[in-house]
């Protein structure tokens, strides 16, 4: 975990995420923080399709770039006193955030992305969502989402929210092991399911997960409940969890519309930092 990419729009929420990233970098022994701001000089009016009657608004790209760089420099100056041994670089680009991040992952050899998430009303979540949520939906890399009211504390207790079907279909376990080897935290494994019991395939998954994680001496917890998100958040509160780890499986358009993503709901509804691993 040498390089951490921190996304910022210079809001208080983004500042909190950047401060958390500095703290996290120390525990992960990361050597570099890259502060990144994506701005758009071309932006459609009211987020509707461009037509001859409703043209796009074009801002002065040079002015936007200068302002972005100035704000990034201020942010770096604010963070550096608490970032001993960590290099803080800055980067600003005129691009769509999700596209820019995808390019930077390989170009800058990024190991982890950190973004803030502001609390929103249910209507705002439905209508506009969040940059962080959109990045999560498109990501193929580890992403930490930091709620605006998250506490900045050492990673002493970590909760791994397990969905066996998602783990079985994906390749997240290797990334999970790398994270666990880095943070050296007390591990709680939580699976929330209804009382229908486990299939023979799931029982094999459980056995495999025990074998994989036993060296971390985790606490395995199997909870019967139909509300997965509430159960996980309640468990996190009761056990003073420092971070929740969840595996996110990207879905097609129809699945996105008709299925609820537990990882997305956790991002919206938890006040604990959430580490998303791609399935």
Region annotations inferred by a language model:
Residues 1-56, 157-222, 238-241, 269:
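Small/aliphatic-rich secondary-structure junction motif
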Residues 146-154:
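Flexible loop/hinge segments that line or gate small-molecule binding clefts
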């Amino acid at each position: 975990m040498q390089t951490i990419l921190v996304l910022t729009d210079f809001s208080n929420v983004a500042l909190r995420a950047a401060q958390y990233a500095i703290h996290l970098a120390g525990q992960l022994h990361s050597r570099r923080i890259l502060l990144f701001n994506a701005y758009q000089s071309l932006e459609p009016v009211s987020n509707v399709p461009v037509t001859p009657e409703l043209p796009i608004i074009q801002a002065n790209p040079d002015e936007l770039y200068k302002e972005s760089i100035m704000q990034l420099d201020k942010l770096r100056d604010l963070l550096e006193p608490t970032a001993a041994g960590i290099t803080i670089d800055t980067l600003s680009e005129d691009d769509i955030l999700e596209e820019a991040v995808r390019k930077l992952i390989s170009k800058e050899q990024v190991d982890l992305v950190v973004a803030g998430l502001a609390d929103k009303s249910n209507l705002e979540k439905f209508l506009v969502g969040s940059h962080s949520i959109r990045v999560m939906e498109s990501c193929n890399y580890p992403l930490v989402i930091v709620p605006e009211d998250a506490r900045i504390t050492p990673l002493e207790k970590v909760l791994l929210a397990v969905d066996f079907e998602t783990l079985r279909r994906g390749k997240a376990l290797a990334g999970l092991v790398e994270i666990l080897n880095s943070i050296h935290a007390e591990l709680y494994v939580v699976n929330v399911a209804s009382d229908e019991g486990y299939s023979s395939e799931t029982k094999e998954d459980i056995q495999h997960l025990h074998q994989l994680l036993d060296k971390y001496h985790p606490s395995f917890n199997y909870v019967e409940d139909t509300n997965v998100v509430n159960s996980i958040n309640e468990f996190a509160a009761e056990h003073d969890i420092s971070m929740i780890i969840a595996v996110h499986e990207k879905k097609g358009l129809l699945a996105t519309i008709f299925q609820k993503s537990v990882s997305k709901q956790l991002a919206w509804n938890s006040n604990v930092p959430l580490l998303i691993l791609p399935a």
